[in-house]
Swiss-Prot record:
GO BP term, pick one: vacuole fusion, non-autophagic
Family per similarity comment: Belongs to the SNAP family.
Major localization listed first in the record, in broad terms: membrane
Organism of origin: Schizosaccharomyces pombe (strain 972 / ATCC 24843)
Subcellular location: Membrane
InterPro entries membership: NSF_attach, TPR-like_helical_dom_sf
Location of Phosphoserine modifications: 76
Protein name according to UniProt: Probable vesicular-fusion protein sec17 homolog
Length: 289
């Protein structure tokens, strides 16, 4: 018969508060025993589908493990707390996952920390709608993957950061990340086909940033990154759009976007940035009238 997790929690709390670090007759360290009881309670709550209660019990178990300086087990237990909290209490899930990540980095386990930084970014982005925090998490993950020579994973994280930076209006950061991934991908036969998309996104960020001279220079710079970009529809679109921006012609801008979209469907990210650019053109038109 499975023990009542509530009773296990009470027993664990009493054990943790007991006097003395070790029992007199071979009982072991009180924090070790308390940790085991909290873990048993956590798994009991899981069986009962009580996610929040399980998360709290795992968190208490991790605290006991830290008291015995068992940082590796504590980090893994905080991850279990994160998994349990996530559905019902995403903010608590993010909090305990950050503790786990800090423990992993202190132990030099940056690959595992990067994996959980991606999870943390996803919580901030999807559940908590904290775009700035998500952006920072993805940036950290990319840097840690890169330091571990996991270039494909690093690029995936950098692209997540770039997308969010663009949507936040942090266009310079988005441009740096898109160009960084483009340069890293251009010599890889499996990844080279995606370079035109990264450069298109970087170009749109230049336009959204409102610096026409920088945009023209960027179009030349893109050909240095990938000379074959000159023959793509994406490059032609950027050139056409820049012409309409310099002419302050919102209708022509919309026509060029529509024509491109007929053959290459625009995703929601590009559509959002394009609408921002079009709005800027319309404001410029209004200023001229």
């Amino acid at each position: 018969m499975i023990a009542d997790p509530d009773q296990l929690m009470q027993k664990a709390a009493k054990k943790a508060q007991g006097t003395g670090g070790f029992a007199l007759f071979g009982g072991g360290n009180k924090y070790d025993e308390a940790s085991e009881l909290f873990l048993d309670a956590a798994n009991g709550y899981r069986l009962q589908k009580q996610g929040s209660a399980a998360g709290y019990a795992f968190e208490k178990a991790a605290e006991m493990q830290l008291k015995t300086d068992d940082k590796d087990d504590a980090a893994s237990t905080y991850v279990e707390a994160f998994k349990s909290y996530r559905r019902e209490k995403p903010s608590e899930a993010a909090r305990v996952l950050q503790i786990a990540i800090e423990l992993f980095t202190r132990r030099g386990n940056f690959r595992r920390a990067a994996n959980y930084k991606m999870d943390l970014g996803d919580i901030f982005e999807q559940e908590l709608q904290d775009t700035k925090a998500a952006l920072g998490a993805y940036e950290d993950a990319g840097e840690w993957y890169s330091s571990d020579q996991a270039d494909a994973l690093a690029n995936k994280a950098y692209l997540k950061a770039a997308d969010l930076a663009g949507l936040c209006g942090e266009y310079s950061l988005a441009i740096r990340k898109f160009e960084q991934v483009a340069r890293a991908s251009v010599q890889n036969n499996l990844l080279k086909w995606s370079v035109k998309d990264y450069l298109l996104k970087a170009g749109l960020c230049y336009m959204a940033n409102g610096d026409e001279i920088a945009t023209r220079r960027a179009l030349e710079h893109f050909l240095e990154i990938d000379p074959s970009f000159a023959s793509t529809r994406e490059y032609q679109l950027l050139k056409d759009l820049q012409d309409t921006i310099e002419a302050s012609d919102a209708n022509m801008f919309a026509d060029k976007v529509f024509t491109y979209d007929q053959l290459s469907k625009l995703d929601s990210w590009k559509t959002t940035i394009l609408l921002k650019i079009k709005s800027s053109i319309q404001e410029a038109e209004d200023d001229l009238t």
